[in-house]
Regions:
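HDAC/HDAC-like amidohydrolase catalytic core signature
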Residues: 1-254
């Protein structure tokens, strides 16, 4: 993950490769993303956090990137005034950059996710939002893991007005963002199948005992997997996840 030594792993080639495979399969028709207002983002993310990303990205010199380097371990009640220092107040790691394009790209990813959500809410059985940057590590007031806005959570929040929503996250890393955003809610089920946080990013969340809080107890399901497992064991874990989703009986699955 550490981009300074290994190169930037979240790159446009990922979008091109996935789109090429989908077009070859012939299951989807490509439609352009609609534009949605910033209020769709602030329904999920803290407005102060959103304003920070917008301001900070606009001030980074062209061709440069800003990485967080100081973190509020001792005092989280006083956000630093300097924008470059404040990156550490809002970021969960040291390798997710802010630059001139990050905020605009994150807005575009949200628009794409909401376009897919709107299509499904309007009657489409299936929609695939091909987005970058990704989003599942972004919490209500934090970015990281190359994620700035939580596209999945924003789509789920929009769909919630039309029925029950379940989120199934099968990325190798734990979906800490949607867990944190919906942790005390029972109207959105969050299920994550991922490498165990003992050895996998983001390390500090994704444990099996994290089941929700308050009204959300039982509506957050983590299925951490060992470092080594075969296909059979993975399929059994996936079946457990799917059974939990089915028991919730959602109107929409994100």
């Amino acid at each position: 993950h550490h981009v300074r030594e290994r190169g930037y792993v979240e790159s446009p080639v990922r979008i091109a490769a996935i789109r090429g495979a989908l077009e070859d399969a012939g299951y989807f028709r490509v439609v352009p993303a609609r534009q949605f207002g910033l209020d769709t983002v602030t329904r999920v993310h803290d407005p102060a956090f959103v304003r920070y990303l917008q301001r900070a990205c606009a001030t980074v010199p062209e061709g440069k990137s800003l990485y967080p380097y100081v973190f509020p371990i001792r005092n989280q009640t006083r956000p630093p005034q300097e924008l470059s220092v404040r990156a550490g107040y809002y970021c969960i790691d040291t390798f997710t950059p802010l630059n001139r394009n990050a905020f605009l790209a994150a807005r575009g990813a949200v628009d794409c996710a909401l376009t897919a959500a709107t299509a499904v809410a309007s009657g489409e059985r299936l929609a695939y939002a091909l987005v970058r940057p990704p989003g599942h590590h972004a919490e209500r007031a934090a970015y990281g893991g190359f994620c700035y806005f939580n596209n999945v959570a924003i789509a789920a929040e929009a769909l919630r007005r039309h029925g029950r929503v379940a989120i199934l996250d099968v990325d190798y890393h734990h979906g800490n963002g949607q867990q944190q955003i919906f942790y005390d809610r029972s109207d959105v089920l969050t299920v994550s199948l991922h490498g165990h946080p003992n050895f996998s990013y983001p390390y500090f969340s994704g444990f099996e005992e994290e089941r929700g809080d308050g009204e959300g107890v039982g509506y957050n399901v983590n299925l951490p997997l060992p470092e080594r497992l075969d296909g059979g064991r993975y399929r059994r874990a996936l079946r457990t996840a799917l059974d939990r989703v089915a028991a919730f009986s959602p109107t929409f699955l994100v």
